[in-house]
Curated annotation (Swiss-Prot):
Composed of a catalytic GlpA/B dimer and of membrane bound GlpC. It comes from the Bacteria. Belongs to the anaerobic G-3-P dehydrogenase subunit B family. One of its GO terms (molecular function) is glycerol-3-phosphate dehydrogenase (quinone) activity. The gene is glpB. Signal peptide: none annotated. It comes from Yersinia enterocolitica serotype O:8 / biotype 1B (strain NCTC 13174 / 8081). The keyword Metal-binding does not apply. The lineage of its organism: Bacteria, Pseudomonadati, Pseudomonadota, Gammaproteobacteria, Enterobacterales. Its cofactor is FMN. It is an enzyme of class 1 (oxidoreductase). This is Anaerobic glycerol-3-phosphate dehydrogenase subunit B.
Length: 424
């Protein structure tokens, strides 16, 4: 089986890279081992929220020069300074829009999004259906009703209300009861956001839901709900807003996250619409190397039949997705045993304070400045690395996980197109 490009991993980075390559006429395949981390995502995308020294960042693009001094191994530092990463961030915003995603925000300045705990945290892009606020000044909401769903344990309205009250917002909290959900409620393991959304999205449940929300939010100017409506699109939420006559915004729930799933579905649909091939439930087990070039990939489902392409992209994710594997002695990349940025002493891998930066989060594959994978200190000619499997950055403490995935994906797509034009 032969393609122009094979991408190992179907998460945010892999899909975005595949979309950009397919938009430029490349025949791409994505080998995806299973459910990716987007299903656990809030739907918001971070670019850069903190520098490695802990300094908060309000304007991500203006902080890249300082970041390069503090963290030369950071993917942003390798991809270039403000101009390069800023251009890639703008390209990412345009690409996501072409996928039909309605997002708010700009790479020029972070904004605040409301979390499921009622706190605010800075981010780059957020779904239009979640509550956001400017980085400075008081919150824009005066009277809010936070309404949960009776029996739904993955969202606690009182916790959100308490946090908002501490920030000066007048809040009420309550639970709605809808008879249509009673069958699901009898089985707690089935009472999850995705299954609830399938019920609430039905047209016959719109008016009963609207009546219940109107009853519980009589004095409120805005309603906050758990993200349990609009499984495939925002039309059910828009209809509910019209029926209630008030702004209604969604807060992410515990996984599986409906907002993250919608992001994944939109990206995958766009990739396949452009002619891309997705091989779900498969995993690349080994690679065939001739010199510094990969000539074939062997996967679990295809056995001895190699997958061949002129260019390969590793987007296999971090430990969560088995893109990196840790033993008691060391961390390694399981397909090609690529060079890893890590620490030799296991005692240094983690910090006993769970809220402190964890060194292992910066572990990942080492690359050259073109994001080509290093193996034995030598760059492989046709293997680029993108997303969470990259080393040199802390996606949680630095608030840059999605940004690295998006910008590295687009950066590598450009590298691949240029390389393939040279070889034609």
């Amino acid at each position: 089986m032969k393609f122009d490009v094979i991408i190992i991993g179907g998460g945010l980075a892999g899909l975005v890279c595949g979309i950009r390559l397919a938009e430029q006429g490349k025949y791409c395949a994505i080998v995806s081992a299973g459910q990716n981390a987007l299903h656990f995502s809030s739907g918001s995308l971070d670019l850069l929220a903190k520098l490695p020294n802990g300094q908060a960042v309000s304007q991500p693009l203006s902080a890249l020069e300082t970041l390069a001094e503090l963290a030369p191994e950071h993917p942003y530092s390798k991809m270039g300074q403000t101009g390069q990463v800023g251009e890639l961030a703008q390209q990412a915003e345009s690409l996501l829009s072409r996928c039909g995603l309605s997002l708010v925000g700009s790479a020029a300045k972070n904004h605040l999004r409301l979390t499921p705990l009622g706190n605010c945290r800075p981010t780059w892009l957020s779904p239009a259906d979640i509550p956001v606020a400017p980085l400075e000044g008081p919150l824009p909401w005066q009277k809010v009703a936070v309404i949960g769903i009776e029996g739904f344990l993955d969202f606690q309205p009182q916790m959100v209300a308490s946090a908002l009250q501490e920030q000066g917002v007048e809040v009420t909290s309550d639970y709605l009861h809808l008879p249509a959900l009673d069958r699901l409620r009898d089985n707690p393991s089935e009472f999850r956001a995705v299954n609830i959304a399938r019920v609430l999205d039905l047209p016959e449940n719109l008016q009963p839901l609207a009546d219940e929300l109107a009853r519980l939010s009589s004095t409120a100017e805005m309603i906050l709900l758990p993200a349990c409506i609009g499984l495939d699109e925002s039309a059910p939420l828009e209809a509910l807003r019209a029926a209630v006559g008030k702004p209604i915004q969604l807060l992410p729930t515990l996984p599986p996250s409906l907002l993250g799933m919608r992001l994944h579905q939109a990206l995958r649909h766009r990739f396949q619409q452009l002619g891309g091939i997705v091989m779900p439930g498969d995993a690349v087990l080994r690679a065939e190397l001739v010199g510094n070039r990969i000539t074939g990939l062997y996967s679990r489902n295809h056995g001895d039949i190699p997958l061949r392409a002129a260019q390969m992209v590793l987007a296999s994710g971090s430990f969560f997705s088995n893109g990196l594997v840790a033993t008691f002695e060391h961390v390694y990349e399981p397909i090609l045993d690529l060079d890893i940025l890590s620490l030799p002493n296991r005692a240094d891998w983690s910090n006993s304070n769970m809220f402190a930066p964890q060194p292992y989060l910066q572990f990942g594959v080492n690359t050259d400045n073109r994001l080509r994978a290093l193996r034995g200190g030598v760059a492989l000619d046709n293997l680029h690395v993108i997303g969470a499997v990259l080393g040199g950055y802390d996606p949680l403490q630095q608030g840059c996980g999605a940004g690295v995935s998006l910008t590295s994906a687009l950066f590598v797509a450009e590298q691949i197109v240029s390389a393939m034009e040279v070889t034609l």
